[in-house]
A protein has these predicted regions:
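N-terminal Sec-pathway targeting helices
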Residues: 1-13
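Solvent-exposed, non-transmembrane regions of membrane-associated and secreted proteins
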Residues: 17-234
Length: 234
């Protein structure tokens, strides 16, 4: 009887191992496919000349007309196209080529102006466990990291926008973030609020802020946590 139970236990262990190995392979395959997809998109559409980067938006648009921009933060691995879907679910699990993908695509909130002229331009991306997509946003909450990587570049079909990070923190997911402010006072109050919430201490000059750029990804410190990185034009 003991021998039979031993063999049953052994078979169960083997089955659990095989299922776990299969799942791990599935995760690895999914991560690799997504990484390869975006590396190819970058290779085909980002050109570097004398240190300057240019994005071929005509070529990108021919592949996917939902393209609205490209986000790049030197030294972080953040270097991706930005799309805007019909809602905020469309690109959660669909890559730039409109194929199913756990990594999804970096996307602009569907309520924002696609030309990035909203008062608060909100950009979402997954926090992938292999460090891709917006995973590195969490590093902006570290003061030592932020000192070296405080600039985020946003390329659009019409211009290049240089951004400076003014706040970075993690809190429970906010169901609604303001996209439009009723007046300048409301906008200033919001800026004061997000700066108080910032984990690293960031100096900010007194010049007028026209608009905010908010980058959002999942955090895993607590259930339903998000990391928010806010930036303004330099």
């Amino acid at each position: 009887m003991k021998k039979i139970l031993y063999h049953i236990f052994l078979l169960l262990c083997i089955a659990v191992f095989c299922i776990s190995a299969y799942k791990l392979y599935g995760y690895y395959k999914s991560y690799k496919e997504a990484k390869d997809t975006y590396e190819k998109i970058k290779k085909d559409n980002v050109k570097k000349t004398n240190g300057d980067r240019t994005i071929d938006f005509d070529k990108l648009r021919a592949k996917n007309p939902d393209i609205v921009g490209w986000v790049y933060a030197k030294g972080t691995g953040i270097d991706y196209p930005i799309v805007q879907g019909k809602d905020n679910k469309e690109y959660l699990h669909m890559d730039y080529n409109k194929k199913k993908s756990s990594s999804g695509t970096i996307f602009l909130d569907h309520g924002c102006d696609k030309s990035f002229i909203s008062d608060n331009n909100i950009i979402y991306g997954h926090h992938m466990k292999n460090g891709t997509m917006f995973a590195k946003l969490l590093k902006f909450r570290e003061e030592s990291f932020l000192k070296k990587h405080h600039v985020i570049i946003l390329y659009t079909p019409k211009k290049t926008i240089y951004l400076k990070v003014i706040s970075a923190y993690a809190v429970k997911a906010q169901d609604q973030m303001p996209i439009t402010f009723a007046n300048e006072t409301q906008k200033k109050e919001y800026i004061t609020k997000i700066r108080r919430m910032s984990e690293p201490s960031i100096k900010l000059d007194d010049k007028k802020i026209d608009r905010i750029y908010t980058f959002v990804t999942c955090s895993y410190e607590r259930d339903d946590n998000r990391t928010y990185v806010h930036a303004v034009e330099e």
